[in-house]
A protein has these predicted regions:
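Alpha-helical promoter-recognition and RNA polymerase-docking modules of transcription initiation factors
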Residues: 1-121
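Charged, low-cysteine interdomain linkers and short loop/connector segments
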Residues: 114, 121-152
Length: 152
């Protein structure tokens, strides 16, 4: 893993600004710049994956390397889906880009954790509703699990 000190971070910021300046319009977006963006945002993937690995969400079901792999796959998908017009119009382009990519990376890692978590796989819409409510709607969760166990 790459460790960043202050000089490397300054170099990372200038490289990111140059890359975003080159890709103001979707027509100038090429495979080289796509690979450059993926490489530039890999430390973001590592950071997010480490946060998930140390939290209780991924304990026991996925290793840190699996989380980094899922995050990097979702980073590649997110870079392909970036709306460059929105990035060009925003005042702080780096912040806009990071927020978009981090949402996509976190969502992909959460989805991977949910699919690898237990013996019984829940449908994605059910896990999303449980995550949104975060256990507040215990009656709906209990009804769902009772319906599953009664059908067995």
């Amino acid at each position: 893993m790459k460790h960043y000190n202050i000089q490397n971070y300054i170099r990372y910021k200038t490289d990111l600004e140059k890359t975003i300046a080159r890709i103001k319009i979707k027509e100038h977006y090429s495979l080289y710049e796509r690979d450059t963006l993926v490489t530039l945002f890999m430390p973001l993937v590592e950071n997010i994956a480490r946060k998930f690995a140390t939290s209780q969400q991924a304990s026991g079901c996925m290793s840190i390397l699996d989380l980094i792999q899922e995050g990097s796959l979702n980073l590649i998908k997110a870079v392909d889906r970036v709306d460059w017009d929105t990035i060009a119009k925003s005042e702080d382009q780096e912040k806009t880009m990071k927020s978009f990519l981090s949402k996509r990376i976190k969502g992909g890692i959460r989805r991977a954790i949910d699919t690898n978590r237990g013996q019984m796989r829940l449908p994605e819409h059910v896990t999303n509703s449980i995550r949104k409510n975060f256990g507040k709607d215990k009656k709906a969760v209990a009804m769902f699990f009772n319906s599953i166990f009664l059908s067995i």
